[in-house]
Curated annotation (Swiss-Prot):
Swiss-Prot/TrEMBL cofactor(s): FMN
CC cofactor note: Binds 1 FMN per subunit.
Binding sites annotated in the UniProt record for substrate: 45, 69-73, 129, 194-195
Family membership noted in the UniProt record: Belongs to the dihydroorotate dehydrogenase family. Type 1 subfamily.
Residues annotated as the enzyme's active site: 132 (nucleophile)
HAMAP family, per the entry: DHO_dh_type1
Subcellular location: Cytoplasm
Catalytic function, reaction form: (S)-dihydroorotate + NAD(+) = orotate + NADH + H(+)
Pathway named in the protein's UniProt entry: Pyrimidine metabolism; UMP biosynthesis via de novo pathway; orotate from (S)-dihydroorotate (NAD(+) route): step 1/1
Name used for this protein in its record: Dihydroorotate dehydrogenase B (NAD(+)), catalytic subunit
Gene that specifies this protein: pyrD
GO MF term (any one): dihydroorotate dehydrogenase (NAD+) activity
CDD domains: DHOD_1B_like
Amino acid sequence: MTRLAVSLPGLNLKNPIMPASGCFGFGAEYAEYYDLSVLGSIMVKATTLEPRRGNPVIRVAETPGGMLNAIGLQNPGLDVVMAEKLPWLAEHFPDLPIIANVAGYTTEDYVRVCEVISTAPNVAAVEINISCPNVKRGGITFGTNVTAAHDLTQAVVAAASVPVYVKLSPNVTDITEIARATADAGADGLTLINTLTGMRINLARRTPVIANATGGLSGPAVLPIAVRMIDAVTRVVDIPVIGMGGVMTSADALELMMAGASAVGVGTANFTDPLACPKIINGLEPLMDDLSIASLEDLRTQVRQSR
């Protein structure tokens, strides 16, 4: 293994950096900027059973230290993802493990999509999105209720043929309760944090700046919240965490790993700089040299032993 390599259920990664779902499309959108094979993995855009048009515009607005978004899980649906999106990645980047993000209105939706999408040859794991704050039906209910999160996870684990990661919402009183419930239900790993629900108002119009009124807050402003929640979750569950939330630099990525994350998702940074992920990857080893970190697996071991 190289210094940057990390291993998680279903994922033997050359490095821990991956674009977070919803911030990188299905990969082809960024392939014109750099060779995607440099990435550890790609968490592709959420897939639902049927196509979704998403929320009305305006969907995105800048905020101090970040952005609000209310995309509404726009995607072409399972059939198109299986017939076009995943095969394109398999053809052009055959050695790149894909994490397929899955969303739905009902347990049956999640189960059906996971059953099918986990059969794609390049899908190494599925990430079930129980935490999106923008959809008026389904997701947020699963993500904020201990019993619902447990039962959904249990159903998906039984249906999927690859490891299952559960994406947790920060919009809860105690994220460790949801983490324990999904781990007890058989989740192979967790991803956190998703966006925090926020709102801004246009003073001249006296209306919210985005059409959905509320949206998910992301970007550098949420990094300290991500650090706190990753630290809390990794102290109460034994399954690995892919950390995300406000990562803009190599130092941010290492900070999440020092908080307990085993790998790192990069979201909003991809919008401000299409080359954000390779820049973060390239900056890791020099920073590790400065901090006397022999390898990321050594760092993971040290963090676990310090608990």
